Amino acid sequence: MRVYLTLFLIIISSINFFAQELNYNIEENISYYPTNESGLTAYQKAQCRLDIYWPTQKKEVPVIIWFHGGGLTGGSKEIPQALKDKGYCIVGVGYRLSPQVKAATSIDDATAAIAWVFKNITRYNGNSKSIFVSGHSAGGYLALMSVMDKSRLKSYDIDANKVAGLIPFSGHTITHFTIREERGIPGEQPIIDKFAPLYYVRKDAPPTLLITGDRELEMLGRYEENAYFFRMMKVAGQEKIEHYEMQGYGHNMTSPAFPLLIDFIEKFKE
């Protein structure tokens, strides 16, 4: 589905003005692994932290967990400016990176962070029944993997279907290229295995909004991956899934995508 600037402006204008009048707090560098847990490395303690930005005067607000991009080799936790002052509780997550660890470890960290949010976010006025998981590029991949593979959150006694929605921005749906490169597989050689969101397509997945750049401008066939994921989810019976293609934008398509994320949250929040 191709989206134009006029649609973005309509969505932006529909945001509740009252949200901009709220006061917000931010708490940084919260460890989402127990700091007294034996076996944690110094690198894990340093990287596996999150920041929370939340409105102080309003309770049970929707929660957005945001995973940064960087190919699973770079980047750092962030709270996107475009999501601030909208009345939401925003969680920016850091995670371990390759080559310090195997890239798949990033998925373990992302899952642990989501579990922490489920169990603690009410302390920050967040609604644990309205948790949305998002991120750009590698962050979109982590969002998908952590939720589509139900066994991951199940290890924390959390049903992945309790996630209110998935909104990956230009995320891999095949096995991530960094994981493939660690195995000696070229980045342009696609595979689908247990490290691919496509491996876990299912009817009962949370509502999902896939957003990619223009098919002629995106990197590494990212549009086509998401289009295939969309189709296979439909084949599996999932009706609450959409795919938007940002015409005229490449991989760095976050700016026009954020209004779509906000509109999606307003549609599916508790």
Feature roles, as predicted:
Residues 1-22:
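Bacterial Sec-dependent N-terminal signal peptides
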Residues 76-93:
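Short amphipathic alpha-helix adjacent to the substrate-entry channel of hydrolases
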Residues 101-122:
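Alpha/beta-hydrolase active-site loop
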Residues 157-165, 171-177, 188-227, 231, ...:
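The feature captures the conserved acid-bearing segment of alpha/beta-hydrolase catalytic domains
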Residues 211, 227, 234-270:
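C-terminal catalytic histidine-bearing segment of alpha/beta-hydrolase fold enzymes
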